Amino acid sequence: MQKKQTILVVASLLVIVLSVTLAYFTAQIIGEGKNISVTSADLKIVFTDTDGNIEGNGITPGWSNSKTFTVKNESNGTYRYDIIIKDLINTFKTYKYLQYKITSTDGGYNMTDYSYLPKSSTKEDVVLAYEVSIDKGKTHTYTIEIKYANDESVDQSIDMGKSLSGTIYIREFTKPTMKLTDKLMADNPTIGTRTTFTAFTETNTGTLYKATEQIGTNESKDVYYFAGDAKNNWVKFGKTTESSCIYKGKEVIYVNMTNQIRRNPENETECTSTNICDAGGVYGVGLTESECSGIDGTKWITEKATWSEAKKDIYWRIIRTNVDESIKLLYAGTSPDSDKAYVGASAFNTTTNDPMYVGYKYGTTGSLENNRLNTNDSTIKTYVDNWYKNNLTAYTKYLSKDAVYCNDRNLESGQSYSTTSEFAYAPRERITNKQPTYNCTNMSDAFSVNNTSAKLDYPVGLMSIDELSYAGGQASTTLTAPYAWYYTNANGESSYGSSGFHSLSPFGWTGSDSIVWAVNGSRNAGILGYSRTVYSTAVRPSVSLSSCNLISRGDGSPENPYEVYTGNGVCE
């Protein structure tokens, strides 16, 4: 069937040309605005705005323009359609200030937050709303708003003289056919091979690097990974309930002096547990009045913070392909410019006095063989599993059950296992010598849903230190700008603030403390370091999209991330 396409905008073409003098923006609309009613065999689309002119020619950052239209199904059954921008050209340099939002109050596609308008230097059709279903005789009423957000904290003059043009269309939905893996390879035609694994921060787009992976004694296969300051490894997949604890427009910190905890409140109870302790405009809860008063420069405010929750899209960064052709992802927050690319904070294990506590799961004490019995969940696994249960269970069918998350407990060369004397694990030797590997040779360390020797309850884990080394990190070495992708958000800043985060990889045993590899935050940008298992750090889950997934849209950029098709008939 030939695809039906119906125009929706004010005229056959809406072109907005923005030019700038300093911070002053002007806009010109080409095309007259009129009432338009276009009827196909299946849909009737009515553009209800009386004209398409922006109010005045002179606008500043903060400008917005809205258009309203209706879609009525006059066919004999349910109809599925897409809302697209045809022939989009968007040459704005910034990615986050030019935004759009589609709203509908009568069953149509509805966005709760603004999304970034994708960039395109050449004409490109871009889907804004995918597979919208409308029943026979029903009408969907829409408002589309496009705005240029004002940010007084930055110089927005980089967008001077840039342009935006395109046409909003309705088209009949057609199920996508390209697999995400194929799209990834097509969008990254440059394949490199690295032999030196010092810190790597080179900016790149359209580049993958090749390595190999072997699980147990299975066949070794080629895998492909992103490294350095990769710009096109963004994915939007799943939704989460994002919470915030706010006082006077600022986020509040939860402090527990007894347990030496300092983090974001995890629930409404923590957020409103006490009055506010004001430390010079940094607001805390969880302290008693006497604890607050005992800190220099603070004051006790007899008011409460406010707790709120909202559904948000989840953004991820592609780590690599796996040996089963799935695609492994690292959690990157609820927006590309997030500085909270973590789901909370947790110790790796709340006990440290035995080597077995470096295990993502562990067994009993006394020997490495006993440690690998994997009958107990680590503290961090419990935390990750609970997050998954609360956020991603509806998406389980899209995730690989064979993808491996390697908790390599092999010993370093020349080391002997002991519960009383210090020793090191193999990842310390590899990363110190800049020789990472994707291989996971012992099946009791190769955690996956389908591996009975190291069985996961859910298809989720953590990133290994070897994966972080391949991505561009180096032991005891601070990254320099433009950094490596695992460290940065779309603004080129730390995506997880000053917090560090645990990797999945063991480091060693001191004779009294179990140690795991970890990654530093902004105080020591992206250093691959280590931490006692009892230290609470940020938690960044990792999942793997199955090879059966189809790509619905996107090019991997932060403003136009890859999106997985989650309709019927995929990964069943």
PLM features: residue spans?
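Short, polar/proline-rich extracytoplasmic segments that appear immediately after membrane translocation
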Residues: 1-61, 160-176
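Short acidic/proline- and small/hydrophobic-mixed sequence motifs that coincide with surface turns
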Residues: 31, 76-81, 93-95
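A surface/secretory-pathway sequence property marking extracellular, secreted
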Residues: 38-47, 89-126
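Extracellular adhesion/glycan-binding regions together with long Ser/Thr-
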Residues: 56, 108-147
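C-terminal, structured domain-capping segment
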Residues: 63-79, 84, 88, 128-176
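Short, solvent-exposed aromatic-acidic interface loops
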Residues: 86-90, 334-336
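Long, domain-scale functional regions
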Residues: 176-572
